[in-house]
Amino acid sequence: MAEAAGGEQQLLVILDSHGIIFRSYYALRDVLPPTRTQESISAVYGYANSLLTVFKELQPTHVIAAWDASSATFRKERDERYKATRDHAPDDLVPQFARIREMLDAFRIPVVMKEGYEADDVLGTLSEQAHEQGTAVIIVTLDNDMIQLVRPGVSVYMYRPYQKDYILYDPDVVRERFGFEPERMVDYKALLGDPSDNIPGVKGIGEKGAKALIEQYGTLDEMIAHLSEVEPKRTRTALENGLDEAQLSHELATIVRDVPDVVLDMDSARLRDYDRQAVTDLFHELEFRSLLPRLPASDGDDAVAPSNEPEGDYRTITSRADLDALVTDVRAAGRFGYLVVADSAHPVRASQCLVGIAIAHDEGQAAYIPFGHAVEEQGRLLADEGEPDDAADSAGGQLRRDEVFEALRPLFTEPGLQRYAHDSKYGMLALGMADASMWPATDDFDTQVAAYLLGDANMSLQRLAFTRLRVDTVDPKTFLGTASKAIPFSKAAVADVARYACIHADMVRRLVEPLREELDEASLLGVFTDVDMPHVPVLARMEQWGVGLDREVLDGLDRDLTSRIAAAEQAVYDAVGHEVKIGSPQELSHVLFEEIGLPRTRKTKTGYTTDADALEPLRNAHPVVEAILNWRELTKIKSTYVDTLPGQINPQTGRVHTVFSQVTAATGRLSSNDPNLQNIPVRSEVGQLVRRAFVASDCGEDPVLLSIDYSQIELRVLAHISEDEELRKAFRARKDIHRATAANVFKKDEADVTAEDRRRAKVFNFGVLYGLTAFGMSTREGIPRDEAEAFIQAYFEAYPSVQEWRERTVEESRERGYAETLLGRRRYMPDLKSRNRVVRQAAERIAINMPIQGTASDIIKLAMNRIDEELLERRRSGALARMILQVHDELIFETPRAELDDVREVAKRLMPSIELAVPLDLDEKVGRSWGEME
């Protein structure tokens, strides 16, 4: 960013800072996660992005940032309504102002402000002075108020959020866009008003009327002077009645161009050699990885921003001698990071399309061993033994896969070496299912799991390397392409894949120690070492086994659902009296709320919401609602499962292999995808029909499924954590907890508790885990608010320690910034300190739920780890039973019937993995299919 040359035309850019800051914040706050230190960065990122765009697109010689000094301005004194509807800056935005000032200082861009005036007035004054000096000016803003400043030599560069681009307003563009001269924008605002600034305008005059008046009379003064001539009459009447408001609005909308003591200093505004290191350090701290390459050069720098990719001894191994030497080096180092490269992101499918392996045994020392790259102009894969040597030569000397596996097998299977990976479950499955002898021993460190425990919102290796090591990795999209033009790894240049893979493995190797230190400092190393890392191979084996699927059951269900959906459609048509596009929210909204006249739900852009939560309370209001909800359930089940499951059967195994993730849910719960087997409805008839398609198979003689689930585990955890004696006594006595709760709350004998009493007690027993409020209960149960409040009061009188625990947990979590489980797993929640009541209360509900749901998840994980270890040992002795699914509180085993009693004994002995103050009861079912278990 060098100084302008002697005779170069000067261009001053003035930034409407607060406009950019607020728009950036609201546009990005739900898109851009906080940094790993929980710092909100949406406004800073948006401002930085705008600034770098200005540097590139406008190439200014001078830049000034106009700033609001405070909210107290002469306009506020003139009219207390001015901007009165605006909320205070959100809590997480306030600290970002200082960060932006820090960034501007590093870029050596002066900030100009004046007490009692807004940034708009500073902009107006500076642009006026620059114009008088003959300097070209461009104002960067998102506010069309600035258009009044446009003239020859002064332009406005305005961001259009919906088009996601900028438009440069000069006088010609203003006339084309608005139909009047730039200086008439003040008169336009005087008539139309400005809701964002709470400028009233003239009631009864809209955009069309305002433009017509300006076209005929020009200024507001001329309109007033010819008031009796204004037509039509309704416009004249509106103007007569709103004359005072129009004149006030004109005054408020006028940008001051002569603010006292604001003097243009072109010398300080000149873009000089900026502090590139300070900007780079700040961008690293704020995790602005994508912005670093866009930094302009400063004096003494190259024009192109230097690459921050790591330098190292990265090699491609194509000979057995070099491969053996690598193995020797790794053995000497005693540890290594690795990456398995394959053409599929699904770990089981990856085993069938392996491309290569990268290994890093020391910092900056990594090698890539290709064996599955396309040969003969990327026409086919080189994979297994038996491939002719000349084919290997035509693939650039790739080794055969069997030869690579033979050499690397000791590194992955011997217990003495430490193995590190990012998403090590993927590598385990890809290697182990490609060749059973390559199934890795347990990895010692998974950088993805570590980042998850530390609360990183973005757990990608790219982000971890950037935030911890200040290093850029290679994005594979740069050589694989994207969307329809994307190619697989096997068809990419070996050199490109090698560099990417070596850097990846090297970064994994380098990240282990800093992440281990962070885990230790946060007291999370125990959870990492004792719970989550041992859980990785458990999930890998469950994915390896997969689940059997009966195609005939699915085919029959497909025919059944097709018939039911047609009947449900007809039921909707009959209830409405004509056909309707049930899948169109807009058309459905019109039918329900305009034609039928049902109570209106929440307003949307296209009508009123028709989502399930909104329609459920209306189920009994009209027959069409029941029919719509039925149609939706049937079509969702059909499209999500019945139509897609057959295509997800692995042709090599004949089974469905879901992908489990322990790094998705913030509470530590597992999630399942591709396909998601955890969201099949459990209580609906059609959900049970889908579950019937999942069957025991390929597991010895007379295979069966055994389901064992924890009975009300979260309520039992609540009884333990809250130390509520009434709750504990009920569980210890093996009582029906919902009946016991109803008896306590309604002050009845348990024998007198009705089904409705019990149902309502059950709602709140579970609702208390999620912070259910009187409003929530009133809405859910359709009961008066005061009745819900009375029930909640009676509940906490019955279980006073639960209420005390809830209040204590929220306050402790607010003070610490996180809630935690019994084992110390954390969930960070900065929103607990939000000034926004809705945001804060939502965080409080999460703080109440996290220790309960998270502890229950920890209990289940520990149990799974221990069960898997024992079943694995039994399989070494010839047993066949295996754990194949985890669905929330339920574990499902596949076993020959002859081993059923043994598996049952193992599960029941090990599932109470943590000793609580109340017993952890278990329920069990057995059956040939998941949907038919008794």
Model-found features: residue ranges?
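Noncatalytic, basic helical substrate-engagement surface that gates or grips nucleic-acid strands
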Residues: 2-140, 144-172, 245-262
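Short active-site loop/helix that positions an aromatic residue
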Residues: 21-27, 147-152, 345-346, 355-357, ...
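Conserved catalytic core of nucleic-acid polymerases
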Residues: 487-490, 537, 541-544, 599-601, ...
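Conserved "right-hand" nucleotidyltransferase catalytic core of DNA-directed polymerases
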Residues: 238, 242-394, 456, 480-685, ...
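C-terminal polymerase-core module
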Residues: 563-570, 574-626, 797-845, 849, ...
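Non-catalytic nucleic-acid-binding/docking modules located in mid-to-C-terminal regions
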Residues: 3-9, 61-64, 109, 132, ...
